[in-house]
Amino acid sequence: MAKNICITRIENLLKKSSIKTIKKEEIMNTIKTVMAEKKLSSINEVDVDAVAKDVTSQMKLQKQKDKINAIKDEIIVRKYQERILTNFDGNEFEGLASIMVGSNDQITGARDSVSVAQTSAIANLFTEANQAFKKEGVFLLFKDMDEKTQRIVNRTVEELAAEPTLTEQRLGQKPRVTEKNPEIIKVAKVMHEFSENLRQTLNAKGANIPKMWGWVVKHSNDMFEVRSAANRLGLKLDDIKVDPNLKGTDINYNKNFTAWKNFAMQGLDGDRTFANADDIDSFMLNVYNTLVGNKIQMAEGASSIYGSRNYAKGAGAKRILHYKTADDWFNYHLKFGTGTLQEAFYSGIMTAGRNIGMIDKLGSRPIDNFEKIRLGVQKVLIEKGRNTQAISSFQPFKKWMNVIDGSIYTVDNFALARFGAIGRGIGNVSKLGGAAVSATSDLAIYGSEMKHQGDVFLGSMADAMAALARIRQTPEFKDIAEGLGFMMDGIITDTASRNQVGDNMSKGMTDIQRTFFKLNLLTWWTNTLKENAMLGMANYYAKQKNLKLNELNKPLQNLFNVYNIDSVKWDVIRKQAMTKASDGREFINISQLDNISDLDMQKILGRSDLSKSELQIQKTNFKYSVSGILIDRSIHAVIQPDARVKGVMTQGLLKGTGMGEAIGFLGQFKGFPMALVNMVGGREMGFIKKGPNQDIGRGIRGMGATFVTLVMMGYVAMSLKDLLKGKEPRDPRLKSTWFAAAAQGGGLGIYGDVLFREQRDSGSIVSGIVGPGATTIADVLLAINYGIRGEGGKAGKAAYRAVSQNIPFANLFYIKTAFDYIIGYQIMETMSPGVLKRVERRMKKDYNQEYLFTKPSITNKGF
């Protein structure tokens, strides 16, 4: 691009001035941005005063935001320092951890964390978006849009966001919308207005994102497609010529970058995209590295949100690609975007929600603010002569920061991360066929969580069973659950499993896993119980509406205390946030908290000097905090790893690093037992630990009741598995049966046949403990070893085991038994004659167990 003459003149004038270098950069970058946004090739084309006014206002706005953000950050730092020194006296490490990922300690505000705020913000944004589509009667149209409709909707979004021309302004007209279908216009309008409201919300919280059409979908990039750009575009790597001076990781990386860049450049608005870029190739390589590393998903603070302005050179804001038209962007999206337009929309919402939760709790500069809090607490302890070794470094907390800012979803080495994700994905769909059967222990955990809140243990378990027996809720109660913040896994799987949870997976692997977990019934099981848990809690809280906080039962008081719900907040909730269903039952209604009065909000905050807009922000924050209680407790009732457990399991390591991948394989299938120990066991330990709400008896009783019920449900799960395999239940009179039931109920049952196969060599037991990947490798090595030694039978058996245990979908509980009886037992007998009789003898000896029907050894003699 040729350098603009006007820009050159201004730069020369600034060089001769006494203005500081940093200031000169800000002025020039602002002028370039304003000219690009106004599509000006020369300032002479318009009144120079208009440009000057715009430049001045933008620089003033940024200064104001920087000042306000600094004040808010200081308030956050001081508030947390006081909270930790007061509430976590003697365990300051736990107090610092609680800021990010919550704590099980029974202390005021212990679970009022960044991670809960993020989860709640995402869930409520999803709910608000879905309800907006439903209100217009176009939710199904939006959900089921084909490619042609997506393109039209996307184009209409751009037209709705267009600024009126001078002629249109004089005539009082709005920009023209070419689409005539009113339903499509409604879909586009909801998307545009939601995106714009979300942008304004983030700006109100400290960001500085300029108005741009479709902001929320422009986060959309599929790291897998971007990294394999040549293949995605149907190009051969050998035919791509690259700049020899390009600083990529290797020649293939450079060729894929070149293919991606050449395609993207075709639709880019160069003047606007590269307004502040000194070198276009460097700019585009920076963008490419960010996309391949999945760094666009991170929540690093106000100035780093996608699209946020920062005029200082080298600033950390994410680079923006501006396209000439909506069709140009959509053409790019079809090749390199996150699936459909709908997925791009939800993906943008999730990233925005993570940013909102982060900023609300840790301000505009999260890591810097956390370090100020830590150092401030450390300083006070040193002055008191206390030991500060536990909090002397940021390193122990980094693993949790990497979870909440999204670093663990970024990639260091793409190839290693991709192959690791594929390996673990294959493991999931070939070894978790019986996961829903193993999940019967969820019922015990469900009951223990409700008991923790003051409800009835066995009654809550019965309620959960009734929910499963109903198969699905009525539309009315589904709407109530959605309003509380419930998100069905099936709705968000496409996006969440690819960018937000666990491994980053390609579209194909995501679809395979989504189908598999539907077929093994785990999606239905989890959604049903989580939905019922949220409805049950909302109904339980509503039943207490006539009681003041100090009149509630002690367990519920303790629960509200750890989420910072005091008497003033509870009075507002019980007065304002109630709704009655058609069957007469009452529920907490989160959406009603939008309508609380300014006076009530002032009482909650303890101040009356806030503006209308600031009060509205606080009302939304309060609504999200109440929803956060229900969402957070629902993952304790239907256990899944929270941010704290994820940090411990991953140690904050990136995918694509040697240790990150090793830990990924080591931790596969261990999420449930780890969460069980940390979240359920930790919950009860919170009462045993020293503190203002210590109740050792309650903690011991809670652990005991949970353990006994888990063992009982473990036996039920084992028995169901045996029945599905055509076996009798194990003899309950044997001690070994109850040890196995304890292991099953405690989470080891998720391994299915991985750990408890009848056929395995003793050397592979250790491999099973360290993960299914190691088990498969052990079987392959055993087969090779036996083959070298000439032991064909053993080699064949190990090889068959390695293959049969890694066939996707073959492990589905209703397929596995049929496969075994049709051909599996025949193969086993062929590979190792007499093996079926040995299995039957072992079953009788170890478990006092027989087959229900004809013994496999009678009808299967091998081929």
Which residues are covered by each model-predicted region?
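Domain-level detector for long, ordered catalytic/regulatory cores in large eukaryotic signaling
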Residues: 214, 220, 262, 269-274, ...
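Short linear interaction motifs
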Residues: 176-180, 287-291, 296, 302-330, ...
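Low-complexity, highly charged intrinsically disordered N-terminal segments
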Residues: 345-385
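Short amphipathic alpha-helical coiled-coil/interface segments
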Residues: 181-199, 393-405, 423-426, 484, ...
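Small-residue-rich, membrane-active alpha-helical segments
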Residues: 436-505, 662-863
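Low-complexity, small/polar and acidic-rich linker and loop segments
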Residues: 2-197, 201-207, 211-231
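Glycine-centered flexible beta-alpha turn that most often forms the glycine-rich phosphate-binding loop
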Residues: 581-582, 589-673
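Acidic/polar, low-complexity linker and loop regions
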Residues: 147-176, 378-419
